[in-house]
Amino acid sequence: FRIASRSAKMGSATLRFGLLPDEGGQWLLVQHLGVAKATDFMMRKRIVDGETAHQLGLVHEVVDEEDLMDEAFKLARELAEGPQVAMRMLKRSILLAADLTWDQSLDEIAAKTAVTDHLPDAREGAQAFIEKRKPQFNGWLEGRSDPPMDGPAPWESASE
């Protein structure tokens, strides 16, 4: 998910300096814009504002600059409140769909559905629907301990 302010400036600056987009920018732009638009965008070294980026499909939403952080946090909360395991599996299915046939895609999502249908979040979603209330997903994740580690986490010092 990508949100931009109306005043945002976006572009690929590498060619301006005689460099190639070695971080994969060309691949990302081709995926989002198609070959012709990505070629135009990068070869002509275009810099676009938030509205134009939205029209091109580079961002999903454009908001006023003063609302950008509030909207970003609102989106983050919306995603965090969703059924995490099902969302992770759906995201993977969406990413795979471009390279699968129709039948393969149906088989792939059916395999994931066989798992998610038996998670507590599915029961909570169905119960919330029956009770006409907002579901409270991920409650079953609370209280679970992290897997054991041999020694401190990489960001902790051994003396803590």
Residue ranges and their predicted role:
Residues 3-8, 59-107, 114-120, 136-159:
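C-terminal long alpha-helix characteristic of the crotonase
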Residues 46, 94, 133:
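Glycine-rich beta-alpha junction loops
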Residues 126:
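Flexible, glycine/charged-enriched surface loops at secondary-structure junctions
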Residues 23, 33, 47, 108, ...:
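A generic structural signal for solvent-exposed, polar alpha-helical segments
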Residues 1-87, 118-119, 123:
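Crotonase-fold acyl-CoA enzyme core
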